[in-house]
Amino acid sequence: QTAKMLRQLMHMAQYVQSHALHFFHLASPDLLFGMDAEPAKRNVIGLIFEKPEIAVKGVMLRKFGQEIIEMLGGKKVHPSFAIPGGVNRALSPEQREKILQQVDGVIANFQFALDLIKDYYAQHGKEAANFASFSSGYLGLVDDNGNLELYDGKLRLRDEKGTILEDKVDPKDYLSIIEERVEDWSYLKFPYYKKWGYPRGIYRVGPLGRLNVVDGITTPLANKELREFKKLSINGIVEGSLFYHYARLIEALYAAEK
C-alpha cells in the first residue's frame, strides 16, 4: 500500500507539472494576448515581460511537480523509481514536510488559473462553444464508483449524448471494445469503438474526454469545479475543444489535492 501511494504521488506530481506547463507556457499566451497577436509576443517570453506574475505562477507549479519527481526518482527526467512489485526509494519525513508546506500554495495557484480561464470563457463564450466543437465518443478511466481516476482504473466509454456504451472494462482487455484503423497518409493509427465502426466510432481522450465520462471527482475542490464544468451543456457532455483548457486545470487541481 505504501509503495502504491508513493507511485501515486509521483504520478500526481507529473500531472501537476505537465498540466501547468501546458496551460501557463503554451496556452495562456494565446488566451491572454489573443490568437491574432504578433507571434513574437504571443509566447512564454512575451508572457514573462507583459504578465510576469502569471508566468511566475506557472514556473513555480512546474517546479513543485518536478521536485517531487526528483525526490522520489533521483532525477527530474527519466527517474528511476518504480520497479516490479513496488518502488526502490522511500520518501523521507523531511521531504514529506517540504511537500506539505507547499501544497496549499499550489492549490491556490491552480484556482487562480481556473478563475483566469473562466474569465476568458465569460468574455468569449460564443467562440469557446463553437471552436472545434463536434460530436464524438469519449473514453477515460474511472474508479469503481465512476469517479475520475488518473492512476489505475477501468475504462468507460460514453457517446455524445452521455449514454454509457462500455463500463468497467479492464484496460488489459481494451481490444475487446477498440479497433485500430491504418491510413496511408499517416503513421498514426486511428482507434475507434469496435461496435460502431469507423468513422462513427471515433472518440476523444485526454482531459476533456476524461471529465466527460466521469460522474464525480474524489477531492472536494476539483469536484466542485466539475459540477460547474458539467453545466456548460444540457447533458453534461462538453464538446468544444477550447474547453480542454478548463478540463486540464480541473485535473491539475485534483492532482494537487490528491
Located regions from the model:
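Active-site bordering "gate/hinge" segments
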Residues: 1-258
